[in-house]
Amino acid sequence: MSWTREDMVRRAAAELRDGDVVNLGIGLPTEVANFVPPEIAVTLHSENGLLGMGPFPDEDHVDPQIINAGKQTVTMLPGASTFDSALSFAMIRGGHVDLAVLGGLEVACNGDLANWTVPGKLITGMGGAMDLAAGARRVVVLQTHVAKDGGAKLVSRLTLPVTALGCVRRVITELGVFDAAGDHFVCVERAPGVEPAEIERTTGARVVFAVSRRRPEPEDG
Amino acid sequence: MSEGGARGKAGAPAGGKVRPDAGTALDGLRDGMTILSGGFGLCGIAEHCIAEIARRGVRNLTVVSNNCGNQGQGLAILLKTRQIRKVVCSFVGGNPDLADQYLAGTVEVELSPQGTLAERIRAGGAGLGGFYTPTGVGTIVADGKEAREIDGRRYVLERPLRGDFAIVRAAVGDRMGNLRFYRTARSFNPLMAMAARITVAEVDKLVDAGALDPDDVHLPGIFVHRIFEAREHKNAVEFRTTREAGSRA
């Protein structure tokens, strides 16, 4: 039994450290905000120009001019600040953002990331993905272990266009947690009931299993 | 142009910077010009300026903007009217008008990573010849660009962007052109304002000089050449997400 999407998001939230400034990518990573451990404080950065982003507003407090980088309406927490896009990306490239949790299409075991385009599909543009991948102090990717067609997404070498080189520290999938270690991945956790053989079969690079025991179940709440 | 030169006057001339509406504020806009447009998606865009550009029907425009509108609104209006020849942006997702015309080959798209786009515009306004950024190293963005290693890290040279007109939106502006923005409607607006020969500011509220405290000015009036008040805006929301609907936080 592998992790559910919520389990994956909870596991990604366990990567947050007290005092971190965190940028959450569009899609599944955005949901990490809902599972910040109560004993720590993190500050959410949105690259369109907001530090101290809060949750979605309630129906009575929607402000069309307070949005996140996914163009969703959000709120600002006490102590928030707003700024222009150049300053926002100075924060990112300048190494002031501690952690970026991003979606992925492919991650190579040397840390290379592809997450912005698939040739032949409709172009979407990289938005802030290249800046975040190249600039955040630590990059964690949250993605499914294999593509919809069953192809490996953890690979020895990227086949898709690069977002940034050597940037990914850790990948969280429904099968476990994997660290980029140069010429192989290190599996540091396995989801409950997932055997090493299944991981080896579905991974396009060598995997070294650092632990035989899986991490305890994430707690509810 | 009414300023009588290649660029707008940065100081407030005797006739003033204030214009009655977008129509007069965009005097001198011609076919083939480059327009820098502030905002992020549909947030913080100069709606009245965009409507006026559509009304004028000028063509073969190059538009520099993080997104070229979305969901048929904002700058996508100028795609529908086939007035745009080239778009410089970071993101085209959710914009069927742009996707269709790009695939048909009628609109050229130059993609720039969002932070690189912002800094290119800032560099244009700040008089810089470009800058070295780590963003895009090893990607198609770096193709054909000078790369170099500085203190052990690899960088790619990105060039500045400038425009003929900038259309920006601010919450408050005074007669000197000083601007104050609101929330995340700021985004690209102050940057675009810096990098154009003629910057037109569309403000929700126009006040007298002195009404804005100097310490509260986000963008000094030196970057703004024409200003007009527009009280009504659509302020369209692309994704209305609320606590009940989308989050348990």
Question: Where in the sequence are the language-model features?
Answer:
Chain B
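Conserved alpha/beta enzyme-core scaffold
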Residues: 2-249
